[in-house]
């Protein structure tokens, strides 16, 4: 045995040092942005470095659809029109996980991370969520997971047979603890993968997906009268506070009140940017891959509009879906704030015009001012008096001409 070294004893003072003040570092907004970009880059490198998914059976024929919209524009309703189709694997706003994880970022700095998340999901690679979710997770880890009929049907769960209309409350009861790994298996068993997203603010960031030979992507761009969007946002209350902060680039500060209408201005600008990019000298790879839909047209003629959307995306309207669509668009009332992210049976036409009685005329004038370009481009008529506002015989949705959005459909 070797000799054990002796450790000299150190005399310790019995006097206690004075309590030190806690020092918290302060970072400038520029430093926060740099740190956030570094974090995002690390996440992207992690995602890219993982082995890619194996080619699914029939993957070459799979259709990928991105329902592109903004908050409170009827996108949850349109998402359900796709989700309930028996050939569709649907997820609602998967980029919620990116924005929640990187909430100090801005919409622009998070665009790339959101886009790469979309690509992985379209290819049924659910391992991409490792960067945004706990390692131990179930199907219920997805944001608003029960809105996906595919996650409530085999092979993900046996709550509802394929071809039947799912119900969220039943799905939550029976499928909450299903393994997360079943999402990939379910995704690969469908001919269509549809994602609904509200976190893209220009079309150019999606060009790599539109030109990607591994994808067969269609863009469904849903818009709504900005005056109706404002009324719906106000009714939703603080639900969107975190997202509002990211849209406005507040470095993680939540934003509830928006007296200067900065948010609705940005929403209008984003719709104009996207629509103009798709219709004014668009790149060749966009031909036949973009379709603009107004919520008001969907509310007035739901079956005609959904038939056109299904044809655009290669789906067929079944008798059961037709009956279900009629029922959910011919209910009563306009919905409650608690239904902010849910689709219930209500009168779609009344929903689309509720703002005409709910908003003060002075606020409508302000919206028309900050969203003048969007109103003109998307076909919404301004009002110039409170009487015009409340006169429901005055149609404020202009007809679409034969050349309107000529790039919406393939030649």
Curated annotation (Swiss-Prot):
For this UniProt record, the keywords arranged alphabetically read as follows: Carbohydrate metabolism, Glycoprotein, Golgi apparatus, Membrane, Signal-anchor, Transferase, Transmembrane, Transmembrane helix
Q: Which top-level enzyme class is recorded in the Swiss-Prot or TrEMBL entry?
A: transferase
**Where would I find glycosylation on this chain?**
138, 327, 350
InterPro entries in alphabetical order: Carbohydrate_sulfotransferase, Gal/GlcNAc/GalNAc_ST, P-loop_NTPase, Sulfotransferase_dom
Concerning Pfam families, the annotation shows: Sulfotransfer_1 (PF00685)
UniProt membrane topology term: Single-pass type II membrane protein
Q: What are the BP-aspect GO terms?
A: carbohydrate metabolic process; keratan sulfate proteoglycan biosynthetic process; N-acetylglucosamine metabolic process; protein sulfation; sulfur compound metabolic process
Against Gene3D superfamilies, the record matches this protein to: P-loop containing nucleotide triphosphate hydrolases
Q: Which residues of the sequence carry a binding annotation for 3'-phosphoadenylyl sulfate?
A: 71-77, 224-232
Question: In which tissues has expression of this protein been reported?
Answer: Predominantly expressed in small and large intestines and colon. Weakly expressed in lymphocytes. Not expressed in other tissues. Down-regulated in colonic adenocarcinomas.
- TM region(s), chain numbering: 31-48
Q: Recorded GO terms, molecular function?
A: N-acetylglucosamine 6-O-sulfotransferase activity; sulfotransferase activity
Query: For this UniProt entry, what's an example GO CC term?
Result: trans-Golgi network
Where would you find this protein in the cell? Answer: Golgi apparatus membrane
Topological region Cytoplasmic: 1-30
Top-level taxon of the source organism:
Eukaryota
Q: Briefly state the protein's biological role.
A: Sulfotransferase that utilizes 3'-phospho-5'-adenylyl sulfate (PAPS) as sulfonate donor to catalyze the transfer of sulfate to position 6 of non-reducing N-acetylglucosamine (GlcNAc) residues and O-linked sugars of mucin-type acceptors. Acts on the non-reducing terminal GlcNAc of short carbohydrate substrates. However, it does not transfer sulfate to longer carbohydrate substrates that have poly-N-acetyllactosamine structures. Has no activity toward keratan. Not involved in generating HEV-expressed ligands for SELL. Its substrate specificity may be influenced by its subcellular location.
The UniProt similarity line reads: Belongs to the sulfotransferase 1 family. Gal/GlcNAc/GalNAc subfamily.
Recorded hits in PANTHER family, A to Z, give:
CARBOHYDRATE SULFOTRANSFERASE, CARBOHYDRATE SULFOTRANSFERASE 5
Kindly provide the name given to this protein in its UniProt entry: Carbohydrate sulfotransferase 5
The organism of origin for this protein: Homo sapiens
């Amino acid at each position: 045995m070797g000799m054990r070294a002796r450790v000299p004893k150190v005399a310790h003072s019995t006097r206690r040092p004075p309590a030190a003040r806690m020092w918290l570092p302060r970072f400038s907004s520029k430093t926060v942005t740099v740190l956030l970009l570094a974090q995002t880059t690390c996440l992207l490198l992690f995602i890219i470095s993982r082995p890619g998914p194996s080619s699914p059976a029939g993957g070459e024929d799979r259709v990928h659809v991105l329902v592109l919209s903004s908050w409170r524009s009827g996108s949850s309703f349109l998402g359900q029109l796709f989700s309930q189709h028996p050939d569709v694997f649907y997820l609602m706003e998967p980029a919620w996980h990116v924005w929640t994880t990187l909430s100090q970022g801005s919409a622009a700095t998070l665009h790339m991370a959101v886009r790469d998340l979309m690509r992985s999901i379209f290819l049924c690679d659910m391992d991409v969520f490792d960067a945004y979710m706990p390692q131990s997770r179930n199907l219920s880890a997805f944001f608003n997971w029960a809105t996906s009929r595919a996650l409530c049907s085999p092979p993900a769960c046996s709550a509802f047979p394929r071809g039947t209309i799912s119900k969220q409350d039943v799905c939550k009861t029976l499928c909450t603890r299903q393994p997360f790994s079943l999402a990939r298996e379910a995704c690969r068993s469908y001919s269509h993968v549809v994602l609904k997203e509200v976190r893209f603010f220009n079309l150019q960031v999606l060009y790599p997906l539109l030109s990607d030979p591994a994808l067969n992507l269609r863009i469904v761009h849903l818009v709504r009268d900005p005056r109706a969007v404002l009324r719906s946002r106000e009714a939703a209350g603080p639900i969107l506070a975190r997202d509002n902060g990211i849209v406005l680039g507040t470095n993680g500060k939540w934003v509830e009140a928006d007296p200067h209408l900065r948010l609705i201005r940005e929403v209008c600008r984003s719709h104009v940017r996207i629509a103009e990019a798709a219709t004014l000298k668009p790149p060749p790879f966009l031909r036949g891959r973009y379709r603009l839909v107004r919520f008001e047209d969907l509310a007035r003629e739901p079956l005609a509009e959904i038939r056109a959307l299904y044809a655009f995306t290669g789906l067929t309207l079944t008798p059961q879906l037709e009956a279900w669509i009629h029922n959910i668009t011919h209910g009563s009332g306009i919905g409650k704030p608690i239904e902010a992210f849910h689709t219930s049976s209500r009168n779609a036409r009344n929903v689309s015009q509720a703002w005409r009685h709910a908003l003060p005329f002075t606020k409508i004038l302000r919206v028309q001012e900050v969203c003048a370009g969007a109103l003109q481009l998307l076909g919404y008529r301004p009002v110039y008096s409170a009487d015009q506002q409340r006169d429901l015989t005055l149609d404020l949705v202009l007809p679409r001409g034969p050349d309107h959005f000529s790039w919406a459909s393939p030649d």
